[in-house]
Amino acid sequence: MKLLTANRANKLLYNFLKVNHITGNVLLPANICPDVVTTLHHAGLTTTFVDLQADNLCIHQETVLALAKQASLMLFVHTYGIEHDFYSFFEQVREQHPEIIIVDDKCLCLPDLDVKDSPADLVLYSTGETKMVNLGGGAIGYLADKWQYDEVEVEENALLTNELWLLDPKQLYLKMDAIIAHKEKLNTIYRALLPETIQLPDAYQHWRFHILVPNQQQVIEALRAEGIPAECPYPALDDACVVANNLHTYAIQLYNDKQLTQEQATRACEIILAFGKEV
């Protein structure tokens, strides 16, 4: 596979689509970042939003297999940076629909600088400000050898500008070690102090720490009132997508990066626990 770099993952995706003249419909999860949808539409593709699978919170696999014959591309997102190998699903899609293009969006995962092979046509990682490893910008991609790649000038969309970004592997690995260590310190606090019943499984806790509570907005407001950042996930882009909508309604993303200290993480748990049986 070819190693690609750009200022943003959306730029890598856009270049890939335009240079290879890819058109048609894209299947993508309903909780996708809206910037990705903008990129796809700007490249001239249409989109179909698919609900999430309850057991892994990624795009619903049976729905993808049912709709794939009407699509030219599937964009698979590793929800909340879940570190799991979905290659068997990709191979199943490819076996039933050989012509479909597969983009493996791992932008919330820990970047890998040594991807030698994948059943996906394009694998994306990001090192932007809100991602797992924050280098202040930049993206890494791996492209199957059969595809072409080149820079495409974009005049109208600031999300896709051609800013120069150079990959520094040494800097990336140094950052990764420090980031992982800090995240684990904060995650240890969250795991120990918060009820296990409201925590998502560990596979979803690398990028941020996720909990599910019935009074999401009140908890977020209480945290922010003390200067502790917290977010809810993206809303579903299709109201019929129940699992994605439920995550938007009940999930809270607790920060575990350099923005937060261990003292703040402890205080966040105290605030959440103060809601008592409501959480």
Annotated model-derived regions:
Residues 46-55, 231:
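Short beta-strand->loop structural element characteristic of the AMP-binding/adenylate-forming
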Residues 170-173, 177-191, 198-212:
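Conserved glycine-rich beta-strand-loop-beta hairpin in the small C-terminal domain of fold type I
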Residues 55-125, 129-135, 141-147:
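Active-site phosphate-binding strand-loop segment of PLP-dependent enzymes
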Residues 143-181:
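Active-site C-terminal subdomain of aminotransferase-like
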Residues 1-25, 33-42, 49-51:
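Phosphate-binding glycine-rich loop
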Residues 251-263:
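Proline-centric
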Residues 216-252, 276-279:
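Conserved PLP cofactor-binding pocket of PLP-dependent enzymes
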